[in-house]
Amino acid sequence: MAVATAPSLNRHFPRRISNLYSRVKQRRPWLPPGDATLFNSRRNWDSHLFVYASSSSSPSSSPPSPNSPTDDLTAELCVNTGLDLFKRGRVKDALVQFETALSLAPNPIESQAAYYNKACCHAYRGEGKKAVDCLRIALRDYNLKFATILNDPDLASFRALPEFKELQEEARLGGEDIGDNFRRDLKLISEVRAPFRGVRKFFYFAFAAAAGISMFFTVPRLVQAIRGGDGAPNLLETTGNAAINIGGIVVMVSLFLWENKKEEEQMVQITRDETLSRLPLRLSTNRVVELVQLRDTVRPVILAGKKETVTLAMQKADRFRTELLRRGVLLVPVVWGERKTPEIEKKGFGASSKAATSLPSIGEDFDTRAQSVVAQSKLKGEIRFKAETVSPGEWERWIRDQQISEGVNPGDDVYIILRLDGRVRRSGRGMPDWAEISKELPPMDDVLSKLER
């Protein structure tokens, strides 16, 4: 086999072809494109890594056995074979292939692919701890983008586990154990939302340093003034200078620490917003989309609580259906404890073409297509008044985290109204007053709605 590398480490999709120059239908990527920035899943297809297979290893031929002689195996072949096995539902055999690939001195790209797909196998089998260990190695040693983990539907069940929450927190804090790429992305978004924070922190640090230097020269003068004698500086004046310097240092350091605290809080909120944007929904046409794909199109209203409470709120909302639809409201009911296994988790890597079509964010540049008038019109036509959650456990975890951050007891009945740009507009205990919401939210064709996008 020949491997054609490209500048981008995370943009690579294995493809099999019957010869070196003719391609056939694309298979599931080793890794989804991981270099997309947060809150923007737009992808650049200018550079890829392609894996070419000779005619002896074409799709029609049977995959090599894991017990084949080592001389005939390469890490690349094992990864491709593992993907084929996963497509056929043989997760255990696929796991063996990825482990074999790691034992064959793989290059960094093959190592990244093997560890990532091995983690997906563990996640499929419910082995959260092993999945975290593989992902941590890929993040730390092989430059895996954390956005890849957030975007991959094969890891939907894993993202609902407490192990993922721990991994996400580690990635947010950064460090040698997990790498800093996710934290760097968060900092970039934080700077966009608070563009002058970096400038303020610089001046706080500079003023504190200046006061410290001044204090360094003031201390000897203060000692000399206290001792007195000929030529000693005025004690009152020197004490005043020292007090000003100390006060300046305290104030500047306090402001610097306050800005750091606000930045950390903002990055936590950005992390939650990013997690929310990747939660899947099933529209009335049975099409599965991520919440981020509905931006600028609807205002999701999440209703979380006991089944009776949510059902009653949905019935009341139906009385204001026309007004709410004019305002782009999409109801998303989440019933506590209703954990159904979604289809996309069962299918794993080998999702059928029908499933792949229903989730256009996998393996195709959805955002670019969605910008076209035709695609947007089609999506709007599929959106009705209500959507069904996919991976309810993942939705519950996000809502409970949001409740904790807002000081609400986890498990209480709550509602969360999102803006057109995907951020939280407001939230509250209990269920919303639909008449009030109809007055509060502007119609979709209103100027205020255009400014909200």
Curated annotation (Swiss-Prot):
Q: Gene3D superfamilies annotated for this entry?
A: Tetratricopeptide repeat domain
**Membrane topology, record value:** Multi-pass membrane protein
* Biological process annotations from GO: photosystem II oxygen evolving complex assembly
**Where is it located?**
Plastid, Chloroplast thylakoid membrane
Query: Can the keyword Chloroplast be found in this entry's annotation?
Result: yes
> Which residues does the Swiss-Prot or TrEMBL entry list as transit peptide?
1-92
Q: Which PROSITE patterns would you find in this protein's record?
A: TPR (PS50005), TPR_REGION (PS50293)
Residue spans crossing the bilayer: 202-222, 238-258
UniProt KW keywords: Chloroplast, Membrane, Plastid, Repeat, Thylakoid, TPR repeat, Transit peptide, Transmembrane, Transmembrane helix
From which domain of life does this come?
Eukaryota
Q: Write out the ranges of the repeats annotated as TPR.
A: 75-108, 112-145
Q: Has UniProt tagged this entry with the keyword Thylakoid?
A: yes
Describe the disruption phenotype: Pale-green phenotype and greatly reduced growth. Disturbed thylakoid membrane systems.
General function of this protein: Chaperone required for efficient photosystem II (PSII) assembly. Binds to psbA during de novo biogenesis of PSII.
The record's misc note reads: Accumulates even in dark-grown seedlings.
Record note on quaternary structure: Interacts with psbA, but not with psbD, petB, ALB3, LPA2 or LPA3. Is not a component of the PSII complex.
What name appears for this protein in its UniProt entry? Protein LOW PSII ACCUMULATION 1, chloroplastic
Species this protein is from? Arabidopsis thaliana
